[in-house]
Structure formats: structure tokens, C-alpha cells
From Swiss-Prot:
Residues annotated as domain Peptidase S8: 119-595
Name of this protein: Subtilisin-like protease SBT4.14
Post-translational modification: The C-terminal propeptide is autocleaved.
Propeptide feature: residues: 29-115
Gene: SBT4.14
Top-level taxon of the source organism: Eukaryota
Residues with glycosylation annotation: 176, 225, 233, 446, 458, 618
Keyword Protease: yes
């Protein structure tokens, strides 16, 4: 979820995290005795939990500490899905632990951030869509987030029977948590760093609202007349209203999302029996084996569980996409055909539209209009006053005025309101494609409009303006959100990321009453539903589609579900999205087509190991994923083709030293459509690129039959930084299976 480039959801989203492999160079004389939490990974899931926990204690005791101290230092033993533990160690102790024969890897625990109605109709999943309700009721979706609001209407269990027999999870009792029902069938929290700030509650209850919003988006029941103070009124619902939810609270509003808690959440979800995991969390770029979400999702994949994750909110900068593992379905954020704007009426008769949600009707026809610079306390404060920073403004010059402020941080309207101002016009070129909620009359305009307003102020001694209450506006869509993180994939030049785009702008969904709408001091706005934007909001849309597909095909692998979603996507116009597939992957989700894709590109865990070997991984770096140091790439049959992966998309990265590049991609598809089918290849090649497919026709005589083919791509050298788009479509009379082909020339090798 996002608020602004600077505030990032104010108190919650400023938290960042990176996993560091422990090495002697990271320790210094100053921190040698300082202790921090580390995750010590020992390998695959053990057979005997009790003996494994004893082993964890004994390993800690070997650091010349007592058994009692070892028990105090250990905060987690992971024994249900993999073998690991988390404990408080000094850098020297962590180094010694890494040298132990039993230990596969050691990583420092740090923190990640959250990537934070009409959208389902927009993507083609209306209430009338075909459903297998009996199977849908058996689908269990695990959400790793900030908790959930069990009293929300979105989580009523009317008409739902008891949880599926396969469910092994639990639900409290917990403090300040009313409990689960047949909709929310599981709820747990994870917090063992000893840091519980004031206002937090040790329970799965959501005091931030993020987890409630994402959970209701993926599987909320129908709630009629849902709105935000009358805005975006309609029926709120999730993709699969009959599916079950399990909440794993791994993020805390004031202290973030810890590695060790995220791993504990994954372990619990795997053990409990979820089938889809939705996680709208991310952090700085890391390699595939040193990232807690990567490791947790790999183990989930091995158990047949698909992890759907947000791509991140660091766009439009290139190479910023996170959660870019091939076994994760990585989601970009797109816009739907509505937005929210407020009209600004100037005293000279001119009017402009500002972006944002301001639910306040003006009490006067107009107010004096003043720039932040003109309201400065003194000359020395004028630079800071242009941003309307509180300490730089003269209260008397602000009171009763509409202020014009440059964007310099979040909560500008809070400052203006506290000074008695009548409103704020915020000038910014950041994220003007999504509507920020304001706690006072306010709206955002781009710098071009801002300059016109500044000129008006300077042209008269009696400038005036009024900000009207927000209204809903219809706009062209879909388009990729400016904030949505872009490729190319920083983890691999051979793998296209993100995978897919889904609505993530101005999404109405359930919220908590334990937090105001903005989270800013002085905000008195509370609502059971709110409008949020971010790849955090896009992620549960795709998780919901994955659950929808799962309800039709309970036996499909994570890779098959992922393939179905990517190859059935609706194309997004490259003309309005210059980053092309690096912005939206396969395109916009198309739920009903995803349930009947015709062909799928399937894979198992060995396929991903082959890919990693092709990426240069070795026994040591593979160990956190596969659970042992004994897996050697030299003993594994190499993956076929240029990318060693049976992926539903193709990416070729050119080398600047060559005048042309030729690559052969090997693929295999499985027939999941009519038993007797014939598919013919259609290729679209961009200028300067040759694409051939062999064979050009695939014939199937039965269901689940597999057919292999190769795609040969030959591309001339291009301008550094350029991306061109090709396409392979396998067509039958009933199905069209789309695979984007991306050719990219990096800015440097």
C-alpha cells in the first residue's frame, strides 16, 4: 500500500529489511558483543520434533553458554516444514555457528515493509461468473500480513459449514480477538523479538487495517452498500467469497515484519494446510537463497502451495521488482476505470481537478489563497515553508487560508489543519494516478497546474480558492500504476518479472476501526471500509484468482495455476505503458479464462533447482532452499534451453559486445483442455528480431498429454536500455495461450 513517495503509509511502510549472509567481514570491534537475532537453518523437516528442539538447544550451548541461557536466547524452533531455529547471537557467535557441520546457513533477522467492489467486475469476475461452490468452500487461503478484524461484515460465515477435514490449524484464544468462525478458520501471530510498542496487542487482531483490507479483497463475503463515506458505493466482495481464510500476523504496525516471524508464518501455513499464500510484503533486492520470503515460498511450493506476492512500490524506476523468484507469482499494480478527484475553483474563474479523497464539503464559497512561502515565519524559513513544514509557518498567516504547498513529506494537510487552515493544495508529480485520503480539505495537483496557481497568487493581493468535496470520475483503463515496481528482474537476466498485473489503485475493501483512515495525529475519520492503493492491494486480487482456478482444478500444481493465470491474461497497451512487460508481465488478470487455459507450462521443484544451477548457484547457496549441502549442480541434469526453465514467458537479454544474439528456448506444455486438440503457433516478432517455433503445430489425443517445442530467437544489437516485445500464441478453436517474448538490451553488462 502507498501513501506518498516520502511518507509510505506514514508510520508503517518506512520499515525496510534485507537478509545478510554472515561473514567475518560484517563483524567489527564495536559490535562484536552486541547481540541480534539470527536464523540458523539446518535443512529439511525433521522426523522427531522433540529431539530436534533439543538439538537446537545443544547447538546453542556449544557456544560456551549454559542450557538455561540457550533456552532463553532461542525464540523459534522451526520443525513443521523445515529444520531451523532463531536465536539471539553476537556476530562472533553467528560466525562460529556457521562453521558448525550441522548448520546449512545463518542469516541476520531484519525487517521488511508492507507493499500497501468494482475491481472484480472490471477484471471480468462478476457475481454471475461460473463457480464450483462446493470446491470453493474447500479452498484455504493463508494471508501473511498485519492481522485481521474478525468482527468485519466481510468475514461473516453465513451458509458455510465447518472447516475442511484437511485443516490442521488453530485459533487462540487471544486477547482482544473475538475468535474465528467458519470463514476465518485460523489465526496466529508471531512476535518474539521482545519489542512490543505501546498500542500493539499480542494477538492476530489488526490495528493497522492492511491485513483486513487484503484478506477481504481475496475472499471477503458480499457486503451490500459498502463505501467510504458514500464514495465508491457498491457491493464489496472478494474473488472467492466461499473460500476459507487463515491469518498469520507477521507484521506489526510500529515495528515491521521480521524475517524470523515471516519464516514462522510460512512454516505454520504449510503445516496447517493452506493451498494459496498471499503475502503483500517485500524488502530490498536479495538473491534467491538469502531472502526469507524466497526460502519460505520455496518450501511452500514443494508442498504444493502457490505463493502470490506483491512486486513492490518502488516504480517507475527500472530494476526495482521484488519477490522475483520463479516459484512466486509476482504481481504488479494496475488501475481500473475510476478515480477520485476534487475540483479546485480559483477566484479568477479558473477551475482545475486535483487528485485525492477529501470528504469535506466547503463551509464557504471561497477562502484566501496563500503559498507556503508567503506564510513563512521569517525570511530564513521560506525554503522550508514552501513545503509547509510546521516549524517554518506562521500560524496567523495560515489560519483560515487555503495553502499551496510543495510535496516534501506526508501529512501536509494535518499541519494546515492544526494551524487552523481551511485546506491544502499539494503540488507534486509523484503518484498522481492514485487517490490519497486526506484528513482535512486537500487535494494534489501536478507541477504544471501548481505553477498556474502560483502565478495567480502572485498576480493579485486577493487570491482565493475553494476545494470541493471529492467525486468519482471514469477514466481509461487498464494502465500500470506509476508506483508499481518494474523489471528487469534484478535476480536473473533470463527471467521476466513481474508476472502479471492486477487492480491495485483505489481499491475499496474492509478496514479496521482501531485506526483512523490516515493514521495521522488529529484524524477523526474512521470507517469499516476504506480505499487503498499499492501492489499490496494487487496481490490479493491475483491470490483470489489463483484460489478461483484451484476450485476448478484442485489437483493442479503451483506452476500450473501460475501458468494458467499468466497465459490467459488480457494484453495491456504498450503505448501508454512504456516499460511494456517490465511493467505488467503477461498482462491484466483474466479470471474466467484462467480457469480454462487449454495448455499449461508445468514444473516441479527439480526444475527450479536446474534453473538455479544455470544461474551459478552451488551446493552452499542452494542449501537454504533444498535443505542440505549435499545437492551438487554437477550431479543434476542441466535444464534445457537458454533459461533452463519451463516458464510461460520468455526473456532474452542481449550482450552489448555482440552484433547479434541467438538463443534457443525449450518448452513443454500439458494439455488441460479437450482431450483431442490441435494448437497452431502464431508468432509476432518486433523489428530487428527473428522468432521461429518448431514444430509449428501441437496435436493432443488425450488429457494431460505433454508436447515439447522450441523457440529460436535471433536479435540484432539494440540501443542500451531498449526493450522490444514479441509474442507467441498457441491457438486452437477454443483456446488461445499467450506467451510474451521480451528482448532487452541492458544499459551495461
Amino acid at each position: 500500500m502507498i501513501r506518498s513517495k516520502c511518507s509510505c503509509h506514514h508510520h508503517l511502510l518506512v520499515l525496510v529489511m534485507v537478509v545478510l549472509w554472515i561473514s567475518p567481514r560484517y563483524a567489527s570491534a564495536e559490535d562484536e558483543h552486541a547481540k541480534d537475532f539470527y536464523i540458523i537453518y539446518l535443512g529439511d523437516r525433521p522426523d522427531n520434533t522433540e529431539e530436534t528442539i533439543k538439538t537446537h538447544i545443544n547447538l546453542l550451548s556449544s557456544l560456551n553458554i549454559s542450557q538455561e541461557e540457550a533456552k532463553e536466547r532461542k525464540v523459534y524452533s522451526y520443525t513443521k516444514a523445515f529444520n531451523a531455529f532463531a536465536a539471539k547471537l553476537s556476530p562472533h557467535e553467528a560466525k562460529k555457528m556457521m562453521e558448525m557441520e550441522e548448520v546449512v546457513s545463518v542469516s541476520r533477522n531484519q525487517y521488511r515493509k508492507l507493499h500497501t467492489t468494482k475491481s472484480w467486475d472490471f477484471v471480468g469476475l462478476p457475481l454471475t461468473a461460473k463457480r464450483h461452490l462446493k470446491a470453493e468452500r474447500d479452498v484455504i487461503i493463508g494471508v501473511l500480513d498485519t492481522g485481521i478484524t474478525p468482527d468485519s461484515e466481510s468475514f461473516l460465515d453465513h451458509g458455510l459449514g465447518p472447516p475442511p477435514a484437511k485443516w490442521k490449524g488453530s485459533c487462540g484464544p487471544y486477547k482482544n480477538f473475538t475468535g474465528c468462525n467458519n470463514k476465518i478458520i485460523g489465526a496466529k501471530y508471531f512476535k518474539h523479538d521482545g519489542n512490543v510498542p505501546a498500542g500493539e496487542v499480542r494477538s492476530p487482531i489488526d490495528i493497522d487495517g492492511h491485513g483486513t483490507h487484503t484478506s477481504s479483497t481475496v475472499a471477503g463475503v458480499l457486503v451490500a452498500n459498502a463505501s467510504l463515506y458514500g464514495i465508491a458505493n457498491g457491493t464489496a466482495r472478494g474473488a472467492v467469497p466461499s473460500a476459507r481464510l487463515a491469518m498469520y500476523k507477521v507484521c506489526w504496525a510500529r515495528s515491521g515484519c521480521a524475517d524470523m516471524d515471516i519464516l514462522a508464518g510460512f512454516e505454520a501455513a504449510i503445516h496447517d494446510g493452506v493451498e494459496i499464500i498471499s503475502i503483500s510484503i517485500g524488502g530490498p533486492i536479495a538473491d534467491y537463497s538469502s531472502d526469507s520470503i524466497s526460502v519460505g515460498s520455496f518450501h511452500a511450493m514443494r508442498k504444493g502451495i502457490l505463493t502470490v506476492a506483491s512486486a513492490g512500490n518502488d516504480g517507475p524506476s527500472s530494476g526495482t521488482v521484488t519477490n522475483h523468484e520463479p516459484w512466486i507469482l509476482t504481481v504488479a499494480a494496475s488501475g481500473i476505470d475510476r478515480t477520485f478527484k476534487s475540483k479546485i475553483d480559483l477566484g479568477n474563474g479558473k477551475s482545475f481537478s486535483g487528485m485525492g479523497i477529501s470528504m469535506f464539503s466547503p463551509k464557504a464559497k471561497s477562502y484566501p489563497l496563500v503559498s507556503g512561502v508567503d506564510a513563512a515565519k521569517n525570511t530564513d524559513d521560506k525554503y522550508l515553508a514552501r513545503y509547509c513544514f510546521s516549524d517554518s509557518l506562521d500560524r496567523k498567516k495560515v489560519k483560515g487560508k487555503v495553502m499551496v504547498c510543495r510535496m516534501g513529506g506526508g501529512g501536509v494537510e494535518s499541519t494546515i489543519k492544526s494551524y487552523g487552515g481551511a485546506g491544502a493544495i499539494i503540488v507534486s508529480d509523484q503518484y498522481l494516478d492514485n487517490a490519497q485520503i486526506f484528513m482535512a480539505p486537500a487535494t494534489s495537483v501536478n507541477s504544471s497546474v501548481g505553477d498556474i496557481i502560483y502565478r495567480y497568487i502572485n498576480s493579485t493581493r486577493s487570491a482565493s480558492a475553494v476545494i470541493q468535496k471529492t467525486r468519482q470520475v471514469t477514466i481509461p483503463a487498464p494502465f500500470v500504476a506509476s508506483f508499481s515496481s518494474r523489471g528487469p528482474n534484478p535476480g536473473s537476466i533470463r527471467l521476466l518479472k513481474p508476472d502479471i498485473a492486477a487492480p491495485g489503485i483505489d481499491i475499496l475493501a474492509a478496514f479496521t476501526l482501531k485506526r483512523s483512515l490516515t493514521g495521522l495525529d488529529g484524524d477523526t475519520q474512521f470507517s469499516k471500509f476504506t480505499i487503498l492503493s499499492g501492489t499490496s492491494m494487487a496481490c490479493p486480487h491475483v491470490a483470489g484468482v489463483a484460489a478461483y482456478v484451484k476450485s476448478f482444478h484442485p489437483d493442479w500444481t503451483p506452476a500450473a495455476i501460475k501458468s494458467a493465470i499468466i497465459t490467459s491474461a488480457k494484453p495491456i497497451s504498450r503505448r501508454v505503458n512504456k516499460d511494456a512487460e517490465f511493467a505488467y508481465g503477461g498482462g491484466q488478470i483474466n479470471p474466467r479464462r484462467a480457469a480454462s487455459p487449454g495448455l499449461v507450462y508445468d514444473m516441479d521443484d527439480i526444475s527450479y533447482v536446474q534453473f538455479l544451477c544455470g544461474e551459478g548457484y552451488n551446493a552452499t547457496t542452494l542449501a537454504p532452499l533444498v535443505g542440505t549441502r549435499s545437492v551438487s549442480c554437477s550431479s543434476i541434469v542441466p535444464g534445457l534451453g537458454h533459461d533452463s526453465l519451463n516458464y510461460p514467458t520468455i526473456q532474452l537479454t542481449l550482450r552489448s559486445a555482440k552484433t547479434s544474439t541467438l538463443a534457443v528456448f525449450r518448452r513443454r506444455v500439458t494439455n488441460v483442455g479437450p482431450p483431442s486438440s490441435v494448437y497452431t503457433a502464431t508468432v509476432r516478432a518486433p523489428k530487428g528480431v527473428e522468432i521461429t517455433v518448431e514444430p509449428q503445430s501441437l496435436s493432443f489425443s488425450k488429457a494431460s498429454q505433454k508436447r515439447s517445442f522450441k523457440v529460436v530467437v535471433k536479435a540484432k544489437q539494440m540501443t542500451p536500455g531498449k526493450i522490444v516485445s514479441g509474442l507467441l500464441v498457441w491457438k486452437s478453436p477454443r483456446h488461445s495461450v499467450r506467451s510474451p517474448i521480451v528482448i532487452y538490451s541492458p544499459t551495461s553488462d
